[in-house]
């Protein structure tokens, strides 16, 4: 019984791993078709899963995955040892760089969270390092996403 179970478990684990790789590749293909809000275009920097070095995701209670931050392996022009960071809004189908002209070294880790303005109800995405706010980015709605 044990001899039959072990190969079956290995087969299941391998197929799950391979399907997860396919899902990530499919996710990147879908994201590359999202509306780019500001340059540089996501598809110009990321073409395959190996181009992404780190991912951060926020999951909504009702809608599932809502926001993702993707840290790329490519450095902006004139920035040695830095990375591009992209904010992906899965709900609105938009993508935009977190920092267009800011060079962040690879050893700096950012923390992220979403904030809603209590008066205007606009959504913002804040990123910080060591508890210090580094930036705030408006999360706009995408009119192309409306049916």
Curated annotation (Swiss-Prot):
PROSITE patterns: PROKAR_LIPOPROTEIN. It is found in: Cell inner membrane. Keywords: Cell inner membrane, Cell membrane, Lipoprotein, Membrane, Palmitate, Signal. Its main location: membrane. One of its GO terms (cellular component) is plasma membrane. InterPro entries: YfjS_YafY_dom. Residues 1-20 form the signal peptide. It is a lipid-anchor. A lipid is attached at residue 21 (N-palmitoyl cysteine). It holds the Pfam family YfjS_YafY. A lipid is attached at residue 21 (S-diacylglycerol cysteine). To E.coli YafY. Does not induce degP when overexpressed unless it is mutated to resemble YafY. This is Lipoprotein YfjS. It comes from Escherichia coli (strain K12). The lineage of its organism: Bacteria, Pseudomonadati, Pseudomonadota, Gammaproteobacteria, Enterobacterales. The gene is yfjS.
